[in-house]
A protein has these predicted regions:
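Positively charged n-region of N-terminal signal peptides that target proteins for export
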Residues: 1-4
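C-terminal motif of bacterial Sec signal peptides marking the signal peptidase cleavage site
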Residues: 16-17
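A short, N-terminal "cap"/entry segment at the start of jelly-roll beta-barrel domains
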Residues: 21-70, 153-166
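Short, conserved beta-strand element in jelly-roll/cupin
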Residues: 75-79, 89-104, 143-145
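Ligand-binding loop in jelly-roll beta-barrel domains
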Residues: 103, 124-151
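Short acidic-glycine-tyrosine-enriched beta hairpin
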Residues: 108-125
């Protein structure tokens, strides 16, 4: 069932990305992005900012936002115990889990466990965080929609007290 959701979401994304395009030449964005680490699909990106993540994370910008797109696609690797800060997207975000176990939590609600194969759509304006469980690496592809040139408002870190209650 999760594979069907994953492939349906990817097909819908590809169709929506192609739907408003005029005739253009194909563009290769991610040459040599395949990972040599057998459990990872894409090569690790650079280490993420300590100001936005607690713990170690790597962000690989697979498809950057451009003048012709209203979204960006990234691959994020969270090492065990790592999580990003509370944040809000002005437009929705889609999480496609490709490895491991993680958490997604909206402010004031119970955390939702995420695992390989899960697809999660985060509505616009929802303050939330996501990251790895204490004992598992967590990897996801994120499709982040933009409103003009902005996509996220960053908040405070998820405290150890908040995280350790999971």
């Amino acid at each position: 069932m999760n594979k069907n959701i994953f492939f349906t979401a990817m097909a819908a994304l590809m169709l929506s990305a192609c739907g408003n395009q005029t005739k253009q030449q194909p563009e290769t964005v991610g040459k040599n992005t395949a990972s040599t680490e057998p459990e990872l699909i894409f090569v690790r990106g650079p280490k993420a900012s300590d100001k936005l993540f607690t713990g170690t994370a790597y962000v690989n910008e697979l498809v950057p936002k451009s003048d012709s797109t209203a979204y960006a696609i990234g691959d994020v690797v969270f090492e065990p115990g790592c999580r990003n800060n509370w944040h809000t997207h002005q437009v929705r975000q889609i999480i496609l889990v490709t490895e491991g176990k993680g958490w997604y939590q909206e402010r004031g609600k119970e955390a939702v466990p995420l695992k390989k194969g899960d697809v999660y759509i985060i509505p616009a304006g929802m303050e939330h965080w996501h990251g790895a469980t204490k004992d598992s690496r967590f990897v996801h592809i994120v499709v982040t929609d933009y409103q003009d040139d902005s996509c996220v408002i960053w908040g405070n870190p998820v405290t150890d007290e908040e995280y350790n209650t999971l």
